């Protein structure tokens, strides 16, 4: 009985370790970092003020945020 339990435990541990393999670079784990890069304002953004090099404080939005709240 104990050998069957040990074999079952070993198989379960091996299967778990195979599912815990790290993700490749092109899979979903890297997507939040890419979304953060998309929030950086550019001169093309309609709220971007070239004199302050950031967005207008009165018109803060999710896509143009560096001068907001700080």
Curated annotation (Swiss-Prot):
Signal peptide from the UniProt entry: 1-20
Protein name (Swiss-Prot/TrEMBL): Conotoxin TxMMSK-02
GO CC list: extracellular region
The main location is secreted
Q: Where in the cell is it found?
A: Secreted
What does the comment on domains in this protein's record state? Answer: The cysteine framework is III (CC-C-C-CC). Classified in the M-2 branch, since 2 residues stand between the fourth and the fifth cysteine residues.
Which residues get modified to 4-hydroxyproline? 66
Instruction: Give the UniProt tissue specificity note.
Output: Expressed by the venom duct.
Tyrosine amide (modified residue): where? 69
Q: Which organism is it from?
A: Conus textile
Superkingdom of origin organism: Eukaryota
Presence of the UniProt keyword Secreted in the record: yes
**MF terms in GO:** ion channel inhibitor activity; toxin activity
InterPro entries from the xrefs?
A: Conotoxin
Which UniProt keywords are given for this protein, alphabetically ordered? Answer: Amidation, Cleavage on pair of basic residues, Disulfide bond, Hydroxylation, Neurotoxin, Secreted, Signal, Toxin
State the organism's lineage.
Eukaryota, Metazoa, Spiralia, Lophotrochozoa, Mollusca
């Amino acid at each position: 009985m104990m050998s069957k339990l040990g074999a079952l435990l070993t198989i379960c541990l091996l299967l778990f370790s195979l599912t815990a393999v790290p993700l490749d670079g092109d899979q979903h784990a890297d997507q939040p970092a890419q979304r953060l890069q998309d929030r950086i304002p550019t001169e093309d953004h309609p709220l971007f003020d070239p004199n302050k090099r950031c967005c207008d404080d009165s018109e803060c939005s999710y896509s143009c945020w560096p001068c907001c709240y700080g």
